[in-house]
Amino acid sequence: MEIKTKAMGLVEIQDEQIIELVDGFYGFEEFHKYALLDSGKEPFFWVQSLDDQNLAFIVIDPFLFRPDYELDIDDELLKPIEAESPKDLLVFALVTIPPAGSPITANLQGPLIINKKNKKAFQAVLNDGKWNTKHDILAELNAAGRN
């Protein structure tokens, strides 16, 4: 299947790349179907809306720069995506790329959680106070000795 994307024009995708956000992203609740695309620039991925080519998010695996990242998610929140085990889950942090000179940040307070088995997903909100919406990715990589 071909889709139009914001960043890469026309792209061929496979069914396995399609995810369904059961409630949409916060602020974009009306959009539910997305494709998870390789950005071509590791370690980032695109989450591209299938309904609006101008709606796309950059995401990253938060464990790459915060190996101590922990999610305390209530089992009730996992029911809509039918997750049976933590092993079934993929976790991504949404990335913000600001104007030049400002750090690239990741939202660790509102991660994207995907059930690998059925491709259902949701955006969680972590309220433990440890994580915030603007973690400096480069500073965190340097602190973790991974850059």
Curated annotation (Swiss-Prot):
Locations listed in the record: Cytoplasm
GO cellular component: cytoplasm
SUPFAM superfamilies listed in its UniProt record: BH3618-like (SSF141457)
Keyword Chaperone tagged: yes
InterPro entries linked: Flagellar_assembly_factor_FliW, Flagellar_assmbl_FliW_dom_sf
Keywords: Bacterial flagellum biogenesis, Chaperone, Cytoplasm, Translation regulation
BP terms from Gene Ontology: bacterial-type flagellum assembly; regulation of translation
Protein task: Acts as an anti-CsrA protein, binds CsrA and prevents it from repressing translation of its target genes, one of which is flagellin. Binds to flagellin and participates in the assembly of the flagellum.
NCBIfam families listed in its UniProt record: PRK13285.2-3
Subunit field text: Interacts with translational regulator CsrA and flagellin(s).
Protein family according to the UniProt entry: Belongs to the FliW family.
Protein name: Flagellar assembly factor FliW
Protein species of origin: Treponema denticola (strain ATCC 35405 / DSM 14222 / CIP 103919 / JCM 8153 / KCTC 15104)
